[in-house]
């Protein structure tokens, strides 16, 4: 039975099914085989991936996932699932599905459920506020490939990103303001975005511009001057230069400059995950405190907050 003529597809990166070495190896193999993510020629990359990266990285990453795993499962999936359910409650006349680019729930299964319901319009919303070919571009590639097998296609609206959308900036502003009110204002607010290789930017990826757009808009909304707010890039991987300044190196240098109390927000993550809960909240906190910092606080992602669901609802309405 057809529930709706409108289908909404929320897409996030993905997560292992369990905090175990085999599950993480399966997940990393799929993720790191995406040519949008790693564009090294396969003849060079695949031996490294299978012979070095997967055997050694999977064991290390398993321990990290174990430290953040929630009773309900992986934080990214838990929060993304809550987002899907909350948005579906806001849009009773639409069919709302959640999919992950890598792992479960799969894009193919989610799209099939929507198509078989007879939808005539599909809104695709990658949950990445700032466009990058490595994220939003990869979603487009995967969705396009999946849709090839269907003879009848719905009208498709693809939301490229929402780096400056007023509701997104307002949601971040409200989150930070509440944190300031409860914990006090820090010496500096640091916005940490996921990095990408600098080479990808030279090839045309406008990701850093979109991060800067968010940074400027949020700085203005909060009324913070440059001496009170800054932006950095985290999660570098591999041997080539990534976007700078690096989050970890910046945090290590700040105490010597008199910055003793830092609060970190990761605006590029729509839901808390390994990169925020472990890399930032644990690893980078330790770096800052060991360098002489006195107080490190992490401001949670928007997750399934009312402001986040307001934002998702408004983004869907654009289609």
Curated annotation (Swiss-Prot):
Catalytic activity line of the entry: heme b + 2 H(+) = protoporphyrin IX + Fe(2+)
PROSITE patterns: FERROCHELATASE
One GO cellular component term noted in the UniProt record for this chain: cytoplasm
Main location: cytoplasm
Pfam families per the UniProt record, alphabetical: Ferrochelatase (PF00762)
GO molecular function, one term: ferrochelatase activity
Record-linked InterPro entries: Ferrochelatase, Ferrochelatase_AS, Ferrochelatase_C, Ferrochelatase_N
Compartment list: Cytoplasm
Keyword Ribonucleoprotein applies: no
Enzyme class per UniProt: lyase
Binding site for Fe cation: 194, 275
Annotated GO biological process: heme biosynthetic process
Keyword terms of this UniProt record: Cytoplasm, Heme biosynthesis, Iron, Lyase, Metal-binding, Porphyrin biosynthesis
Domain of life: Bacteria
Known pathway: Porphyrin-containing compound metabolism; protoheme biosynthesis; protoheme from protoporphyrin-IX: step 1/1
E.C. designation(s): 4.98.1.1
Residue spans crossing the bilayer: none
Function according to Swiss-Prot or TrEMBL: Catalyzes the ferrous insertion into protoporphyrin IX.
Family: Belongs to the ferrochelatase family.
Name of this chain's protein: Ferrochelatase
Organism name: Hamiltonella defensa subsp. Acyrthosiphon pisum (strain 5AT)
Lineage per the UniProt record: Bacteria, Pseudomonadati, Pseudomonadota, Gammaproteobacteria, Enterobacterales
Gene: hemH
């Amino acid at each position: 039975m057809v529930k709706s003529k409108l289908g909404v597809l929320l897409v996030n990166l993905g997560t292992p099914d369990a905090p175990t070495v085999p599950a993480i190896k399966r997940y990393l193999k799929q993720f790191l085989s995406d040519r949008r993510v790693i564009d090294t020629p396969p003849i060079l990359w695949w031996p490294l991936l299978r012979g070095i990266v997967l055997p050694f990285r999977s064991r290390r990453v398993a321990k990290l996932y174990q430290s953040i795993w929630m009773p309900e499962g992986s934080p990214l999936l838990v929060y993304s699932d809550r987002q899907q359910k909350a948005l579906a409650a806001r849009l009773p006349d639409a069919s709302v599905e959640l999919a992950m680019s890598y792992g479960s729930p799969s894009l193919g299964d989610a799209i099939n459920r929507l198509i078989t319901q007879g939808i005539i319009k599909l809104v695709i919303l990658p949950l990445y506020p700032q466009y990058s070919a490595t994220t939003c571009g990869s979603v487009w590639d995967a969705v396009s490939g999946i849709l090839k097998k269907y003879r009848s296609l719905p009208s498709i609206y693809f939301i490229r990103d929402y780096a400056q959308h007023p509701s997104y900036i307002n949601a971040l502003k409200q989150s930070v303001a509440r944190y300031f009110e409860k914990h006090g204002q820090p010496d500096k607010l640091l916005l940490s975005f996921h990095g990408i290789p600098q080479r990808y930017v030279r090839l045309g990826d406008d990701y850093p511009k979109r991060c800067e757009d968010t940074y400027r808009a949020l700085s203005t909304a909060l009324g913070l001057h440059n001496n009170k707010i800054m932006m950095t890039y985290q999660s570098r991987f591999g041997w080539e230069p990534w976007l700078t300044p690096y989050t970890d190196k910046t945090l290590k240098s700040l105490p010597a400059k008199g910055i003793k109390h830092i609060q970190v927000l990761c605006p590029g993550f729509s839901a808390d995950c390994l990169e925020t809960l472990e890399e930032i909240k644990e690893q980078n906190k330790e770096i800052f405190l060991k360098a002489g910092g006195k107080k490190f606080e992490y401001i949670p992602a928007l997750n399934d907050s009312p402001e986040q669901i307001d934002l998702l609802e408004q983004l869907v309405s654009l289609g």
